[in-house]
């Protein structure tokens, strides 16, 4: 993949095959990303986008291949070690600690680094206003912000975002996208972004991969893919200008 | 490639977070509570034996609260550690060492060691499986104590426990005067320890594990070691509680290991409010006094009103007495019902933004 940095990649997947129990979901996945890179992972439902992130965190069974993180093989590393080594994961289900306050949800994840409580509150001012509220008293958008902020509190070198915009009101989407853009472009946080909103995801990231039935079928620069309506249409059935129905 | 080295860029993780520091501060109601524990000396000197039983039960409930209320480890066999500590303290004394404080320590360590061994099994399971395992473990220990009658005295109880005076000065008297202040001080010391523990980052991690262990792993805290640690600590505390019972009554019966005791302590904790520091303490006070009173009123069917009390609490105060009180305070302060009228929540405000 085009990378301005020829040094050691931040992360690379080498021929990874993974799944749950007997079921194989991902097969022969290979890609790499540089420090401060950003990748959008696109594809229809059920092609293995979330599984890709779960595999990176160590929550699936990895059958073949390896995952290299900053030059170290983490293929067999326990999930909490991966988190400690700088991978932060925001799950699709958000998984807020329902009975902890916003502040406790954040401090429980705190690890030394640039992101502390104040930085997180600066980033999501709304969370500061609700700092004493319990996790289960938050709206969906606030929960998403909290999940993102909580991952940031671990001061990750790489942030995994699983459909962060799902089910949010447009105004909240706007706010969150603004935050993510700042994080990715200005602050250079490395991000893998799984998202159904292809256009938003592509506008935020540098590179993109398209998944189809557990395999990577297309690699591109996000800016190029954004214009490549034919490919988008074929793999995600995005209704673009030419109005062709999605191919089965 | 990162612009700043994370290790040097921020304050040390050990610096206390302000909101954690705020929780550590003592509230007035806490001072009142602990001063009130001295009342029995003045108000009810005839009931000091009961008061010491309450203090022991409170310590036992506090130990269960650490694992159940804070770490979410269900246990139906917590009496195993209480009983193990009770027998350990009894045997130490029977074998010729009647010094109470070192006896407490030995009993605590023995129970803690048992808890540590057990914790490797506990950390692997959750929910229903835990109920079965702890239940089975408790029954096993009870039968072991029953059949090892040469050591434990079996169904006749352990005879020949003789305690020396506390610090060589204060003899355990018939009225329970020494027993109560002794039990109370032990309770207070362990309460301070528990309070410190749960207001630490470790305590917060435990609550995270209770809420969602997978998520805790994903933010870098493996639940296994945390659970093993707190389980060992709780077993130590339960053992000490058992030891205090042995030392203040100078006898040990099989009842200390009974399933009934495990069930009672669970009821007490739920009654008071699990996951709250004072839940077990309040629960112990209410339950023990109610039991004493009901059994005086009607010696035959005294469990009936206890059952009514339990059902009422679970129906109307699902978070226990303390949970109910907290809710009441919220309501009175208007936070819950009327607060949003005076200060609209942020989502309303930003929704009206152009």
Give the location of each predicted region:
Chain A
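Helix-to-loop junction immediately C-terminal to a conserved catalytic motif
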Residues: 57
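Conserved ABC ATPase signature
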Residues: 134-138, 142
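Helical segment within the ABC ATPase nucleotide-binding domain
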Residues: 174-187
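The feature captures the beta-strand-to-loop junction immediately N-terminal to the Walker
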Residues: 42-44
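ABC ATPase C-loop
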Residues: 151-152
